[in-house]
Amino acid sequence: MRCPFCQSDDTKVLDTRLIDDGSQVRRRRECVSCGERYSTRETVDLNLPHLIKSDDSREAFSEDKLRSGLLKALEKRPVKTSQIETSIARIELKLMTQADREVSCIKIGEWVMEELKALDKVAYIRFMSVYRQFQDIEAFKKEIDRLMR
């Protein structure tokens, strides 16, 4: 791996650790040429199924879209970045273990709601209100009452 500071190819690994429940490898590196230290993260390059959208069109799974949706729901909520990354990894694992090469966006949405429900109930309600297209306050009240039981 090239040094991000001097672009040298001559680097060495000082430390290697598993992070995010073993879904990533963090390596601490040092450039032999300039002496700068930096960290890298490695993840598996996945061949994930395509998603079937509500209009029956297909699109490739996008981790960025998944992350963006989670971050919108979790905006200004007390949830650590590491918890969000772990949730993303769990959703991707579910996606990888699907036998089908195409998965409905509805299923992805359900998985996101499961993760948000475990992380933060307010974020869960935020996401659900958009995902399920709540039309009035009664829909919010009904879901909050269901959560409180």
Swiss-Prot record:
Keywords: ATP-binding, DNA-binding, Metal-binding, Nucleotide-binding, Repressor, Transcription, Transcription regulation, Zinc, Zinc-finger. GO terms for molecular function: ATP binding; DNA binding; zinc ion binding. Binds 1 zinc ion. InterPro entries: ATP-cone_dom, NrdR-like_N, RNR_NrdR-like. GO terms for biological process: negative regulation of DNA-templated transcription. Its cofactor is Zn(2+). It comes from the Bacteria. Residues 49-139 form the ATP-cone domain. A zinc finger (unnamed) spans 3-34. Pfam families: ATP-cone, Zn_ribbon_NrdR. Negatively regulates transcription of bacterial ribonucleotide reductase nrd genes and operons by binding to NrdR-boxes. HAMAP family: NrdR (MF_00440). Belongs to the NrdR family. NCBIfam families: transcriptional regulator NrdR. This is Transcriptional repressor NrdR. The gene is nrdR.
